[in-house]
Amino acid sequence: MAAKKPVNWWLWTKMLLGGAAICVGGPAFTYWLTPTDEELFQKYNPELQKRSLERRFERQQEFDDFVTKLKEYSKSDKPIWTVQAEAEEKERQQRASVQKSLALADEVKARKEAMRREAGLPLEK
């Protein structure tokens, strides 16, 4: 029977230490190098800082609306993208009906004005 090969403990120790250094050190190095939001903001030129501050509330509101819609969509059994497409279609139809009713109201107003002109009555403002 052949003798067993001895285990190369030094090789395994180097491998484990190297793997641990990569697994722990890589993310730690990335975390250390990534600038914070404040550091990025300080690197903006003054005009961009001003514009960013002006639009901050608006962007936060848009994000909050987006998250609220996502929560609402996730309550459905359907996939989110399907529910989102249905909601967009419903909103598009609503806008079209509103535009149609506004056009109809303008047409009615124009007819009334034409009738008042024909009758010689004063026009409404």
UniProtKB/Swiss-Prot annotation:
Compartments in which it is found: Mitochondrion inner membrane
GO CC term, one of those recorded: mitochondrial membrane
Domain of life (superkingdom): Eukaryota
Family in the record: Belongs to the CBP4 family.
Protein name: Assembly factor cbp-4
Name of the encoding gene: cbp-4
Coiled-coil ranges per UniProt: 98-118
Keyword Coiled coil: yes
